[in-house]
């Protein structure tokens, strides 16, 4: 059973999947930082210094106006649409980057497929048989 598990775990697809998940997690952290530390502050500056991460709709009377989102969540129920907006921007960026990567891979793949395949040289014995056939056909005419 241990040997069977070893074969399964070391198969190419499982290892490739593990590498993909690890790289994906690291890429997610980079995109998170890009959105939260670069894009959202720019959007906030353009819109007059708004911090979208603290935008919410209180659903409880215990939540007071002006409370930070994290504190408001502790006090009562809130709908954090600012946080949702930030995550939607994250998703859009990740989807766009993945689209560009897959598009680039498809272009490279189509270029590779478009290259003319090398024509295999006909073996000498087949070539000789073809010449004999042609000579015999010429005699009949």
From Swiss-Prot:
It holds the Pfam family MscL. Homopentamer. This is Large-conductance mechanosensitive channel. Channel that opens in response to stretch forces in the membrane lipid bilayer. May participate in the regulation of osmotic pressure changes within the cell. SUPFAM superfamilies: Gated mechanosensitive channel. Gene3D superfamilies: Large-conductance mechanosensitive channel, MscL, domain 1. NCBIfam families: mscL, PRK00567.1-4, PRK13952.1. One of its GO terms (molecular function) is mechanosensitive monoatomic ion channel activity. The chain crosses the membrane at residues 14-34, 38-58, 82-102. Disulfide bonds: none annotated. One of its GO terms (cellular component) is plasma membrane. Signal peptide: none annotated. It comes from Methylorubrum extorquens (strain PA1).
